[in-house]
Amino acid sequence: MKLLSAVVLLALANPSDGRADAAWATATVARLNALLEAPNSERAGAAERLVSEHLAVDEFAEVTFGDYLEKSLDAYRGLLSSPRFTHLVDHYRSRLARAYQHRLSADLAVQLASPDWRGLRLDSLEVNGQRGRAQLRALFATRSLGVEADLIFADGTWKIAELKIDGRPVSSHYRRRYQSLIDREHSPPVLEAQLAEREFVVLEDFAATWDGSQPMEWGPWKKKDRQKPVLYRVEGRPRRYMAARDSSHSVIVGKFVHWNPRQYPIMTWCWRAAALPLGGNEFLDDANDSAAGLYVIFSKNWLGVPKQLKYVWSTTLPEGTVGRRDKLFRPWFFVVESGAANLGKWTFEVVDLEKHHREKLGGRPAKRTIGLGLLTDANSTRSYAEAYYADLRVWTRQAFDGGRVVNHCGGLPVSNGVYSGENSP
């Protein structure tokens, strides 16, 4: 389906009176054909405008992805009220539509530069109220293809709701392109990253909240903790982060997020410890507190016990320490920051999830993770801990091996309007 994106050129201009007729459509096709002669720099901008202004992106995305969002977010259905679950789905629906729009624009810009494409010819146009259908031929140097555009008139403009090339829907092509991800119900940020053709997935940037401070997808992981005080809240402008403060409660907050850790095995994040629990030592029951802790829950074993790893900022254990408490089902932990040397500073962390899974949990990780957890606690030491978490990402191994995994902690506020000076994202 070589023309899969170029057919967005069928986007029809907006007649001032809302009518669609053959003369207007012919003029539009002529204008779009003229665009093929424009410089490449102009084509890219024109592709973005055409898709933005003339494609019914919401309808196109719904036809392409169906109920993918509802299925990928289904774990929240029993945890959120019906209005909140609907709001969560709508939040990601809007993000997915924007990502899809950018993908179509980028593909169209490439097709506009194809030397083999000669133009479009309008064969017929039928209009019935708020719906219409255009039949065209896409002309190439040695062949032509039939193109059918379903049109919808909404908000005072005609837009394309679906396209077919020689009878094959363009939406079906894109669905097939991402079929594996859709079938495995990986989380929306993964699909957004693949639509953007990025080498990393932003698992969490804490930009989405219910009320400005309560993170949209995070909540107490254990039922017994749901009645405890809220220890975590989103803060910061313009870049946001999760603030955690604890003295006696020790609440893990979790988020369901599903990605393939074989495809994206490198995890990076930013965190800052402001107060270390006194004498914290992750090996000891009576001192098992960490200023900051990040859990990665890969899967469950045959007993239903989570297969997970924990990365910590320890008060006393040296960086590089790996271990776990001598109790049943306790997770392996990795000390990636230690002590007060970097206290008050945003630090950038990089870990190889696949390597650590193989070393401590055995074999390769499952192809779909369960989620993430955060824990700042000081209950065992009866002291106080405070930390901040930001910008959790996973990367391809190719990006890591190629040196393209970069520090993305720049611009995070330290305190009183002072910002970190690391590289911007």
Predicted feature locations:
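Early exported N-terminus immediately downstream of N-terminal targeting peptides
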Residues: 21-104
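Surface-exposed, charged secondary-structure patches
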Residues: 85-146
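Low-complexity, intrinsically disordered terminal/linker segments enriched in charged
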Residues: 162-202
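Extracellular carbohydrate-recognition regions
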Residues: 193-223, 403-422
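Extracellular beta-strand elements of beta-rich domains used
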Residues: 206, 372, 390-394
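Short carbohydrate-recognition loop motifs
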Residues: 228-252
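Extracellular/lumenal carbohydrate-interaction signature centered on repeated Trp-anchored short motifs
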Residues: 256-267, 340-343, 365
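Extracellular beta-strand ligand-recognition surfaces/modules
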Residues: 289-294, 329-339, 343-384
